[in-house]
Amino acid sequence: MRPLVIIIMGSPGSGKGTQAELLAEKFNLYHFETSEIIERNLAAAEKGDFIKIGGKKYFLSEEKKLREKGKWMNPPLIAFWVNNKIKALSKEKKGIVFSGSPKTLYEAKKVIPLLKKLYGISNIKIILIEQKQEVSIWRNSHRRICELMRHSILYTKETAKLKKCPFDGSKLVFREDSDPKVIKSKLKEFKERTLPLIDYFKKERLKVKKVNGEQSVAAVFQNIFKALND
């Protein structure tokens, strides 16, 4: 039996990372946090570093500037990093839960066929966590990450007073992209570039289950668990 793949979709601050961590623990999956992979690759890059994909050079310093402005990086570069990691996890026979990929149609067309081939269509589950724009802006402006592993901690009544990461115990700090202007830019990108993926998934015979993300972390998790078993 092939391992399970769960794709968690949702606007910024919807709790994708938190739910992915819970699902990873529940089903013994690798939490594929795309933002963490991006940040680690950019942090390790030196001046002038680039990656050549399809004959085009992608300079990491320029990609970093896009990210800092709340703009999305070039999809070919993201897909390159994501697919390399997927192949490595498949060789280890490890299941995956995604929080942040795929984000664009380009990325989906590169990632989904690979996932189908390596894991099988029946083992791919997609969850869309829904929330209003004002909720997203408020949550994002309060969201924090831990210094050690950059776990994203959703701001809720349960986490408001936390000073240390519940996953690794390191100090919690505010994210660099917590500025309201950056958040609004990301929300615009999400509506224009990510939501259209739902139609693509349907064409690929993949079901998308919707969950109300404006509940407590525990309630959202219960609804996701139910959706996965429907």
Where are these regions (language model features)?
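Glycine-rich phosphate-binding loop of ATP-dependent small-molecule kinases
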Residues: 1-230
